[in-house]
Amino acid sequence: MNASGLIRGYLAKNVETEKFLTHVATTIQRQLQEWDEHYKVKVETCPGHPFLITIHVNTPIYKVVLSQEEVRMNQEKGPYALDRLIWRELQVQGMVILYSPGNYLAHVL
């Protein structure tokens, strides 16, 4: 999957945190669906509480909890810092990252 650093940089600087997280989750889902079309990524939000990202095929298999501050700090850190944080946590939980054509994974790993 290909990704545009210019567009992502613009989003990181100009979109509110929750919308940016939703964009990142959608990008992660698109990448996962290149490996298996049944992957789904869900972001649950509740004001004042951490964000919960659940990734599943048929049943939930990976969960990533991020505070609003973690999301905001990584959004400010760089256009792909939040993606990197999520992918690294997925690897810690046992997800195997597959080779894919395109530059997205090169940006985040």
Question: Residue locations for each model-derived region?
Answer:
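Amphipathic alpha-helical interaction modules
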Residues: Q29-L66
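Negatively charged, low-complexity tracts enriched in Asp/Glu with abundant Ser/Thr
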Residues: M1-V43, Q75-R88, V92
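Polar/charged, Gly/Pro-rich intrinsically disordered segments
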Residues: A3, P60-R72, S100-L109
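Intrinsically disordered, low-complexity regulatory segments enriched in Ser/Thr/Pro
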Residues: V57-R88, M95
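A short, charged
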Residues: R84-L109
